[in-house]
């Protein structure tokens, strides 16, 4: 596999937690999109479905005009980051340049990649007990 195989926009179909014993438990529904560009950049935005709207922000994209409580509520469960990507064997490495969680900046997220036509699966490395999560994506427009 190579970088060009991932280029495009992908929408999440679903995610699941896989236990070390092989049992699978679906995770909460999410609204997610990941993009890979031909020149090696990527970004992902992942939010819980059904988030409540905040008070009007006068057309602003940020939440600076909302209350601290509204900002906190809007941010719960949000994962968003961007940076560079590189396919290495059966893995894709996301080198994080900017992120909602500032602790992730400078990290590299490794995901095992499975690609079948317009369907993509990204799996996190297993923890010490063999548990991991995976996200299923479909190429946008397919």
Where are these regions (language model features)?
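Lipid interaction determinants
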Residues: 1-80, 87-142
């Amino acid at each position: 596999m190579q970088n060009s195989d991932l280029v495009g926009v992908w929408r999440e179909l679903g995610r699941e937690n896989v236990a070390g014993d092989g049992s699978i438990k679906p995770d909460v529904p999410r609204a997610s999109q990941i993009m890979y560009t031909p020149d090696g950049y990527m970004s992902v935005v992942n939010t819980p479905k059904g988030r409540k709207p905040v008070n009007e922000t006068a057309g602003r994209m940020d939440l600076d005009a909302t209350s601290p409580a509204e900002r906190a509520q809007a941010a719960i469960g949000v994962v968003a980051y961007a940076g560079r990507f590189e396919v290495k064997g059966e893995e894709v490495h996301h080198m994080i340049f900017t992120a909602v969680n500032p602790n992730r900046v400078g990290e590299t997220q490794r995901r095992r990649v499975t690609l079948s036509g317009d369907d993509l699966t990204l799996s996190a490395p297993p923890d010490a007990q063999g548990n991991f999560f995976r996200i299923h994506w479909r190429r946008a427009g397919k």
